[in-house]
Amino acid sequence: MISVIIPVYNQADKIGRCLDSLLAQTYRDFEIIIVDDGSTDHLDEVLLDYELKLQKAKIPYKIIVQENRGANAARNRGWNESQGDFLLFSDADIFWRADALEKLVNSLMRNPQASYCYSSFRLGRKKFHLWPFDPERLRREPYIHTSALIRRQDFPGFDNAIKRFQDWDLWLTMLEQGKGGLFYDDFLFTVAGGGRISKWLPSFAYKLLPFLPQVKKYQEAATVIKVKHRLPYDPK
């Protein structure tokens, strides 16, 4: 079974499309764990409507409400409450292609040496084609997103102290533990446009757009990751 874990903070206007895309999946052996990380919008009303849809579709689910503790803490809470052999962390502003879960789980089943499987994605109408798994590239830049399918037995948990580049930190930690990934060469999900663009900004943009305030913050955060994992960095 796959546990789809969705941390949510004030995204009542986005999560419906995410849940609709999960309801439409061709692969049906999954549960949904929603972690409301202290939202102050009308998320509870939206989720009440979707509880009926999930029950009708016979999809197991949990809705967890906690005080705002940040994305990593919400993801870890969902992980601790989940039951699946595979984990998929989906942000609320993502909607999935109908065969996404099927493609990801089949890829991992055919490749037992891989601990996780990731794909390319779209940000609004723009395509972001990622690269095959490469440990050296991964040490240089954060090119693998959080929304990969992960074997539960290989997942070490997120570091709650890390506020940015949580995905890079996770994959580097797993790499240090001898665990690698697998690239599925297709676009399996779309990130809704109009949100916090820096959250999904590709790593190369940090070098091209250094004047943007959010990019500067992410450059500083990248240094934190490099220091933690003993990677080369520019101390300037």
Regions found by a protein language model. Give the residues of each.
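Conserved donor NDP-sugar-binding/catalytic core segment of glycosyltransferases
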Residues: 99-131
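Glycine-rich, basic loop-to-helix element that forms the pyrophosphate-binding segment
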Residues: 66-82
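Acidic donor-binding loop at a coil-to-helix junction in glycosyltransferase catalytic cores
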Residues: 164-172
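Catalytic beta-strand/loop signature of glycosyltransferases that borders the donor
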Residues: 120, 182-188
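Acidic donor-binding segment of Leloir-type glycosyltransferases
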Residues: 19-65
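Short aromatic/hydrophobic "clamp" motif used to bind/position activated sugar donors
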Residues: 87
